[in-house]
Amino acid sequence: MNTSIKNWPEQERPRERLLQQGPQSLSDSELLAIFLRSGSRQHSAVELARLLIQQFGSLNAVFDASYNELAQFNGIGATKYSQLLAVKELGRRYLDYHFSQTELSLHSSHLVLDYLRYELKGEKQEVFAVLCLDAELRKLHFKKLFFGSVQHCAVSVNQTLRYALQQHACQLVIAHNHPFGSPQPSPEDIKLTQQLEQACQLVEIRLLDHFIISPEGSFSFAEQQLLNPTSIAVQ
């Protein structure tokens, strides 16, 4: 039987907790419940949100689901589906504007990772990318340099370094994706990072980090102390 959120203790209601503690204090299902606003006769908004995430596997997958897939759930109709599409598009436009700024400052590893996830989203093959930064951690240029298969991408250290020098980079972040599976680095990934780090040191470019991004998460070489201590990691 549906227990209305209105009957919950105030400190447990998602909207009240969001206002008091901030959105980061809420789970994916609680945030989705605030968006849904109402559930169905059988389920509260939070219960419906949990069912949706369980069914589709993640919050992202809920937003990517078709109308026919979502309409199977009581409480989801054309109105809520159109709202989902609108919120998804608003998020995309926000990121497009934010990351297209010419003076984009990437002064923390969190911001760098967000930017790289944005640039590499949707790639179905391995892609190796380079982010060039100036001395103040402002973006100079970003480029996807090498493309491979689902499981492998051949990378040239010389071409990577040449590109960084052409952009007058003072600092560098490299990244590649694992389209499927774990973000854990392979022995080849570790060897490549070491080679690039050594090459960067020769031309006085600081390699700040190497990120691996996958559907299961991300891996930072700097955070795992797999870069030389003389390199300055993004704080």
From Swiss-Prot:
Residues 105-227 form the MPN domain. It comes from the Bacteria. GO terms for molecular function: metal ion binding; metallopeptidase activity. Coiled coil: none annotated. A motif (JAMM motif) lies at residues 176-189. Residues 1-20 are annotated as: Disordered. Residues 9-18 have a biased composition (Basic and acidic residues). The keyword Metal-binding applies. InterPro entries: MPN (IPR037518), RadC_JAB (IPR025657), RuvA_2-like (IPR010994), UPF0758 (IPR001405), UPF0758_N (IPR046778). Keywords: Hydrolase, Metal-binding, Metalloprotease, Protease, Zinc. Pfam families: RadC, UPF0758_N. Zn(2+) binds at residues 176, 178, 189. Gene3D superfamilies: 5' to 3' exonuclease, C-terminal subdomain (1.10.150.20), Cytidine Deaminase, domain 2 (3.40.140.10). GO terms for biological process: proteolysis. Belongs to the UPF0758 family. PANTHER family: DNA REPAIR PROTEIN RADC (PTHR30471), UPF0758 PROTEIN YEES-RELATED (PTHR30471:SF3). This is UPF0758 protein A1S_2918. It comes from Acinetobacter baumannii (strain ATCC 17978 / DSM 105126 / CIP 53.77 / LMG 1025 / NCDC KC755 / 5377).
